[in-house]
Swiss-Prot record:
Name of the featured protein: Vacuolar protein sorting/targeting protein 10
Database matches in InterPro entries: Sortilin_C, Sortilin_N, VPS10, VPS10-sortilin, WD40/YVTN_repeat-like_dom_sf
Gene designation per UniProt: VPS10
Keyword terms of this UniProt record: Glycoprotein, Golgi apparatus, Membrane, Protein transport, Receptor, Repeat, Signal, Transmembrane, Transmembrane helix, Transport
BNR repeat residue intervals: 55-64, 151-160, 359-368, 423-433, 469-479, 717-727, 814-824, 1099-1109, 1141-1150
GO annotation (BP), single: protein targeting to vacuole
Family the UniProt entry places it in: Belongs to the VPS10-related sortilin family.
Species this chain originates from: Candida glabrata (strain ATCC 2001 / BCRC 20586 / JCM 3761 / NBRC 0622 / NRRL Y-65 / CBS 138)
Skewed-composition ranges (Basic and acidic residues): 658-674
UniProt lineage: Eukaryota, Fungi, Dikarya, Ascomycota, Saccharomycotina
Length: 1514
């Protein structure tokens, strides 16, 4: 029985449909590393690779070689952007080739013959002038040097000429002003170029209106440095640089819509040079800036997504930007526009505050969460609740299109990152479904109706062979096609760039074996996948289409957009090949609120209402001085809605918002008025926080002004613009417990939360990795870091702890070496460990680790030991000390405190972590049993220690000691130096200037010990690292011009005294700044003792402490900015709403009111380098609803006109001068004359450049007494000499022999040692060694080393003696005897011709005789002089004894002085004051009077009574 024919036809069609597959061909002849470039609206493909240029006109089935590569230069290809269907250029073999007919024919472009092209950089095409091309190449000039050259062609690339802009430059970037056919610039061939030099302030912006024949310079504004430009259809955007010395400098944007007039755009936050990734234009002429705010060049999140950590969107005139982030916590986000779907954006919140993905389909006005659904229950990964099923997309910035709302993306559900899948959306990204269970590369065809995907892992389906999957119904169903090769896919593209075609090329690298991990890059696999015969080539009819409305049919910028797309189930080809995706547009009749934006004077609040933008008004000054009415909203540019809404005007109060208005402020300010150098004004930005601000710290980098702030409520905030804007770190997350910064890696910080998590950032808080800490109680102890490995650190936790007071609770040290991914217990009972090997310069191992270990068996005595390891305790540790009190690492030293039997402390020091030496304390320390000491620092080559000599009833003071260079022996610098209960000492080194130290001493120590008085403090200062001390010289007048009232004008009764380190609320608030060289600010008083804080005034010095000025009555807080170019003060401990500031190094002061209401300013902070123009005020206030704190960011950048010019080639015409620290230009400090750099103009700011690097050492000086300090156990006398401490005998140096059994000899100390900082040369030499002495018991070895044996005696003495006797006899025989003998010796005179000279020998002998005669006469005369001096001395002595001494006026000669100096110091060698013995015979030196300091006299080469200056050169 036959089946009906109609049934056979149906069965045939069904079977054909079921068995249909695309035509897949393996292509041959394609280079393994070739680029595949399809022409638009064409079947022609270019393959450009190592072998050359191949062309295929049949979708790659057959290839023809057109150009062969010789391999001399890199190969590149560029398709003509505006004629992509026919024109392309290829750079090959150092030449440029072009085609005008899809690669069928190629021509060589002609260039000037004097240059050899080596690399193509850019080729740019005009959308309107089709025959004009501009190109940039690297070429060799006549000297064979490679440089960048720019060319222009006016004949469609056949020939090029040099683009001569008439400017010298290092590089140049040129573009056509019109970048597309939709450009709003004039439709012509105008060319915009920017020339670049090594200094951005010399860059030029140039415009040509005649195809590059001539250029004119465009003016952006006066004193504006810029380094880049961006083009959109409506705007030319210039990126200007505020600081030309900083690679990560802040930038401003200047915008022009006509390439003539430029206006500065308002930015809501600071931007850096590295922040801007790209600028695109959205509907309504709005610009969108994607930002990558990180020090890393390609920061990625856990999914591999590049982090656009924020976005900025402008209003429709391009001049006012607002943040595009939508997170309630302002978390870091990735924001990506879907460019072929107008108004559609996808946003991913990244990091701790991640809220998943959200989407906007109305140009960013509203946002909604991406919705995932599992229709048909196909996904093996399930969610308990579909509402909690978060879709995480993998690469949201890559969309294959264009399509009519059909999107394909990779991603995963919730946290299942390892289970990547392929997802499909058919409504423009609002709703998503799983397409494939595995990740793959993909492409769309027929405008999204056909989808091709290839698994990234060929074995994802348990089959080692590669395959492709394809869908013919927009991703609803999928079919598999098995391929013949095993390979790793690299890319799949639609050969038709507009997405309309049905042919694809799949490329990859083959795998030799199924288990290969690395593909063979020399064996490329290329497939052609052809879908042109799908559905038998049937074209869709009208019934097969549906309407897809963009934005769900809502109006976007006044219009509705509708796509006509194929139905999902239709069995036909929906589009036409080479026909672009089109949409229908319908103008909206009624305008809606979303068609409007806030007027420039307004900004949307949290409820979406336009309110007055006071920050914008203050920053720009764009309003008159009187109140005005302004519409709060305006229609967005290019909006097409017809019937506008009635917009009400709102009052804008502009009082005090535009202080730069010339009507309000005179151009030359009077005293007390603000300076008006710049075009803007000081800006203040407020932020408030619930609770008290308890932590704040800047990252110590110049990349930006990032900081972390935490409150008493456990909330943490991150700012990258010095507190203008904040990110809430733990929004709706666990409270913050502790914050630690890495002292060695300035971009790293660690945040502990109360749930046992550690959040780590290595990019200044832009991104964080979350680490689960080992199970333990957080004790709030600091982390210990490896100084050379940021991934290695030690964490301390409490084990067996129910609470911190639990008796079973003990500290455990955990170490991680992989950045916290894993932790291991370092050592049982280790309570304090440090990576000393990574910080000690002399250590043999960077991994040397010291640990203080608690002995659990001696809990009552709290015994601690010190152990070391170099293998992280994999082997048995080395016990360094059995008992210690503690240890600390300070610079180049590790100092260990070891307990003695009678509660005294012994300190040991090491510089390499292996050899330890007991510190030798001076004999005159006045401390019977040292019970406490403080290590004060070691930055100048010596260790400073404070040993406590008295501590009772919260009163403490002690001796200040300084070590030699290896930290072992100490001398006492000062007694009774003030200390507090916590061990902090009134000791501070002036930052940036070596050897200047301030300290407070207790002047009534005896009364305090007796209990009869309170502390009386006075401040002393040293300018030579502690050798000489003096009280601070006070100013003559106070800030009111009145004299100070002191009992005496002498310095010992009337000096400046300052409150110091022990009284500070924040120990970071130092007198000085390392960038404001020579400047110090302090609170104190003039008198014979330091008064209470509230009775003091505020003082300033700009010359390192030599002279001071009272700048304010009362106590003020202070901060330095811009290297001292800005000084700001705020009342300390009082409610205030203003600050005082100076821009001329304290000569004049101005007040700035930052608020109407008064607050308590608890601190003023800025970046650690003190180089910024912004300051952060930490404020507090008690209000009705509880305690509230805040910050005020005060920005001075608008106050200055320009950046200071630093030009060493033209120093008389820049903004800097060199100055010296000290009273005299000829003054030497530490053996050299130094000059420092400081700006000389108020109108400019310095920026981030380190001025200290330009410090000039003019020359080294000859050594004087000021270059030496007393040696160990020697004490300085009133006359400046160093004498042995009373009660000691010389020769104690022999003790060194006991410590080193191999030593044979030792040397006695001269009593002096050279200051480590001194670089003096020649002159006085006080630290020379004595003659060697034998070590006890080593006399024999000493004699062998320095003694003379019999044979040596014969050679050294007897042989020369025989020679001398023989020579003497010869001279006597040939000279003296022949000429009459000794009888004529007294008659011989130089120049006489009486001597016998018959030959040359006689002449030589007679010359010797004449020299001997002359020498004898000099010796005889010298004997007479000595006899007269002896007689005169006897007479003077007897005259004094008899009371008949009279003034004597003698002409003291150089030699006479030396002789008398020897007499003066004779017999005092043990007191180390024999200065004459240390002087080089041929050295010149000056001896002059010096000012006597209080208690400590400067050294005098003359007696104190004389005032004469004796110069050895006279």
């Amino acid at each position: 029985m036959r089946l009906p024919s109609i049934f056979l036809v149906f069965f045939y069609l069904f079977a054909r449909t079921l068995c249909w597959s695309p035509e897949v061909s393996l292509l041959h002849g394609v280079d393994s590393l070739a680029s595949i470039i399809p022409f638009d609206d064409s079947s022609t493909i270019l393959s450009v690779g190592r072998k050359g240029v191949n062309v295929s006109h049949d979708y790659g089935r057959t290839w023809e070689t057109k150009l062969r590569n010789k391999g001399e230069y890199p190969v590149s290809v560029t398709l003509n952007t505006f004629r992509p269907n026919s024109r392309a250029f290829v750079f090959l073999n150092g030449k440029l080739y072009g085609t005008h007919n899809e690669g069928s024919d190629w021509f060589e472009s002609k260039f000037p013959s004097d240059r050899q092209l080596t690399k193509a950089l850019t080729i740019d095409f005009s959308p309107f002038a089709k025959d004009v091309i501009i190109a940039s190449f690297v070429a060799k000039d006549n000297q064979n040097d490679e440089k960048e050259f720019n060319y222009v062609s006016t004949d469609d690339g056949k020939s090029f000429r040099v683009l001569d802009v008439g400017q010298e430059y290092e590089s140049m970037r040129c573009r056509f002003l019109s970048i597309s056919h939709e450009s709003n610039f004039p439709h012509n061939d105008n060319i915009i170029c920017m020339t670049k030099t090594s200094s951005p302030d010399q860059n030029k912006l140039l415009l040509s209106e005649n195809r590059g024949k001539s250029f004119k310079e465009l003016s952006i504004g006066e004193d504006i440095a810029f380094d880049n430009f961006y083009l959109t259809n409506s705007y030319l955007v210039i990126r200007s640089i505020r600081d030309i010395h900083n690679k990560a400098a802040e930038v401003d944007l200047y915008v022009s819509s006509d390439a003539k007039d430029f206006k500065k755009a308002y930015l809501p936050t600071t931007l850096r040079r590295s922040d801007i990734r790209r600028i695109i234009e959205l509907l309504g002429r709005k610009m969108f800036i994607t930002l990558t705010r990180s020090s890393e060049s390609n920061v990625q999140d856990d999914n591999g997504n590049t982090l656009f950590t924020d976005g900025l969107v402008s209003n429709s005139d391009g001049l006012k930007f607002t943040s595009f982030s939508t997170s309630a916590s302002k978390s870091r986000t990735t924001i990506t526009p879907v460019e072929f779907l107008n108004g559609t954006f996808i946003q991913k919140q990244v990091g701790r505050n991640s809220g998943g993905y959200s989407i906007s389909i109305d140009n960013g006005n509203t946002w909604r969460k991406l919705k995932y659904s599992d229709k048909g229950n196909k996904n093996p990964i399930k969610c308990q609740d579909e509402n909690d099923c978060n879709l995480e997309l993998l690469i949201p910035q890559i969309f294959h299109g264009p399509t009519a709302g059909i999107l394909v993306m990779l991603g995963h559900i919730n946290d299942n990152f390892s289970d990547q899948q392929t997802f499909i959306s058919r409504d423009g990204g609002l709703n998503w479904e799983m397409g494939l269970e595995f990740p793959g590369i993909y492409a769309t065809g027929d405008l999204g109706n056909v989808i091709v995907a290839c698994p990234v892992d060929p074995s994802s389906d348990n089959d080692p062979q590669s395959e492709i999957y394809y869908s013919l119904d927009q991703g609803m169903t999928w079919s598999e096609y098995q391929l013949d090769e095993m390979f790793i896919p690299i890319d799949v593209i639609n050969i038709t760039p507009d997405g309309s075609g049905l042919s694809f090329i799949l490329t990859g690298f083959s795998l030799d074996k199924p288990d290969d991990q690395r593909p063979n890059i020399d064996n490329r696999v290329t497939y052609l996948i052809d879908f042109n015969n799908v559905h038998d080539g049937k074209k869709c009819k009208a019934k097969d289409y549906e309407k897809f409305e963009l934005a769900e049919g809502s109006c976007i910028n006044g219009a509705k957009y509708t796509f006509n797309r194929r139905k999902q189930s239709a069995k036909c080809i929906g589009g036409e090949v080479f026909k672009d995706l089109l949409f229908d547009m319908e103008v909206c009749t009624e305008c809606q609120e979303q068609d409007y934006e806030c007027s420039s004077e307004f900004i949307k609040d949290s409820k979406g209402v336009c309110v007055v933008d006071e920050k914008w008004l203050s920053a720009t000054g764009n309003c008159p001085s009187t109140d005005i009415k302004k519409p709060a909203m305006r229609l967005i540019a290019d909006n097409m809605c017809k019937k506008e809404l009635p917009i009400q005007s709102k009052s804008v109060s502009c009082k005090n918002k535009n202080p730069s208005d010339p009507k309000d402020i005179p151009k030359k300010p009077k005293e007390g008025d603000r300076p008006t150098f710049g075009t803007g004004d000081i800006q203040a930005t407020f932020n408030t926080f619930k609770g008290k601000v308890r932590f704040y710290q800047y990252f110590d980098t110049d990349e930006d002004e990032s900081l972390i702030l935490a409150t008493s409520e456990g909330e943490a905030y991150i700012s990258h613009d010095s507190g203008q804007t904040y990110t809430h770190f733990n929004y709706n997350k666990p409270k913050v417990h502790e914050i630690v910064f890495n002292e060695y890696f300035n971009s790293s910080a660690y945040i502990f939360d109360i749930d046992g998590n550690l959040h780590v950032t290595h990019d200044r808080g832009y991104t964080f990795d979350t680490i689960r800490l080992p199970a333990s109680l957080q004790l709030g102890l600091p982390l210990n870091f490896h100084s050379k490995d940021p991934n290695t650190f030690i964490y301390y936790g409490g084990k067996n702890c129910k609470s911190i007071f639990d008796t079973n609770c003990h500290i455990v040290a955990f170490i991680t070496r992989d950045g916290g991914k894993s932790f291991s217990e370092l050592l049982p009972n280790a309570i304090h460990c440090e990576f000393v090997g990574s910080s000690l310069k002399l250590s043999d191992s960077d991994d040397l680790l010291f640990c203080q270990v608690k002995d659990e068996t001696s809990s009552k005595t709290r015994q601690r030991s010190l152990v070391s390891t170099t293998d992280y305790f994999e082997t048995e540790p080395k016990v360094v000390f059995q008992k210690i009190l503690g240890y600390m690492t300070n610079g180049e030293y590790v100092i260990i405190a070891v307990p003695g039997e009678n509660h005294e402390i012994t300190a040991y020091v090491t510089m390499d972590g292996d050899e330890f030496a007991e510190t030798l304390l001076p004999y005159d320390l006045d401390i019977e049993q040292p019970e406490a000491f403080t290590v004060l620092g070691s930055s100048t080559g010596s260790v400073f220690l404070h040993f406590t000599s008295f501590q009772e009833n919260s009163v403490a003071f002690g001796s200040l000691l300084k070590s030699n260079t290896n930290g072992t022996s100490y001398v006492k610098l000062q007694s009774n130096v003030n200390r507090n209960e916590a061990g902090y000492v009134d000791f501070e080194k002036v930052q940036g200037l070596d050897g200047i130290i301030l300290t407070n001493v207790v002047t009534n120590a005896d009364e305090i010990k007796d209990g009869s008085s309170q502390k009386h403090l006075r401040t002393k200062i040293t300018f030579n690292d502690g050798v000489d001390w003096e009280y601070i010289k006070p100013p003559k007048k106070d800030s009111s011009g009145d004299s100070y009232h002191c009992k005496s004008n002498k310095l010992e009764h009337c000096s400046l005294n300052l409150h110091s380190y022990t009284e500070r609320k924040d120990f970071r608030d130092t007198f000085s700044s390392g960038s404001a060289l020579g400047m110090m600010i302090g609170v104190g008083n003039v008198g014979d003792k330091l008064l209470p804080f509230e009775e003091c005034s505020t003082f300033l010095t700009i010359d390192g402490g030599k002279s001071w000025t009272e700048i304010k009555k009362g106590a003020y807080q202070w901060e330095f900015g811009d290297h001292g170019g800005i000084l700001i003060l705020s009342r300390d401990g009082e409610m205030t709403n203003s600050i005082s500031y100076s821009t001329d190094f304290g000569k004049s002061w101005y007040d700035y009111q930052f608020s109407d209401e008064k607050v308590l300013v608890s601190d003023i902070v800025t970046v650690p380098q003190d180089s910024a123009l912004r300051f952060l005020l930490i404020t507090a206030d008690r209000i009705g609803r509880g305690f509230e704190s805040g910050t005020v960011t005060v920005d001075f950048s608008g106050l200055f006109k320009r950046q200071c010019v630093l030009d060493f080639n033209n120093e008389n015409h820049d903004d800097f001068d060199y100055f010296s620290i000290g009273n005299s230009e000829n003054e030497c400090i530490f053996g050299h004359k130094v000059k420092y750099l400081r700006k000389n103009s108020e109108e400019c700011y310095v920026g981030a450049v380190s001025l200290s690097q330009f410090t000039r050492v003019m020359k080294n000086c000859t050594c004087t007494r000021a270059d030496f300090e007393c040696d160990y156990n020697f004490v300085r006398q009133y006359d400046g000499t160093c004498k042995l401490v009373d009660g000691l005998q010389p020769g104690n140096e022999a003790a060194i022999c006991k410590k080193d059994p191999d030593l044979v000899e030792y040397f006695q100390s001269t009593g002096y040692r050279k200051i480590p900082l001194s670089t003096c040369q020649g002159g006085l030499k006080l630290d020379g060694r004595t003659e060697p002495l034998p070590c006890p018991g080593k006399e024999k070895e000493f004699k062998q080393k320095y003694g003379i044996s019999g044979s040596s005696f014969f050679l050294l003495f007897f042989v020369p003696f025989l020679f001398f006797v023989s020579a003497g006899w010869f001279v006597y025989d040939r000279g003296i005897r022949r000429n009459g003998g000794f009888a004529r010796f007294g008659e011989i005179r130089l120049g006489d011709d009486q001597l016998i000279e018959e030959n040359t020998t006689d002449k030589v002998v007679n010359t010797i005789i004449r020299f001997g005669v002359a020498s004898f006469e000099v010796m005889a005369g010298g004997f007479g002089i000595i006899r007269r001096i002896a007689n005169n001395s006897f007479n003077r002595i007897t005259g004094r004894m008899n009371g008949r001494y009279r003034p004597s006026y003698s002409n003291l000669m150089h030699d006479d002085f030396l002789d008398e100096a020897d007499d003066l110091l004779a017999g005092h060698d043990d007191d180390a004051n024999d200065l004459a013995s240390f002087m080089d015979d041929d050295s010149n030196f000056d001896i002059e009077d010096e000012t006597t300091s209080v208690n400590d006299s400067g050294y005098r080469d003359q007696s104190p009574e004389t005032e004469n200056v004796v110069d050895s050169n006279n």
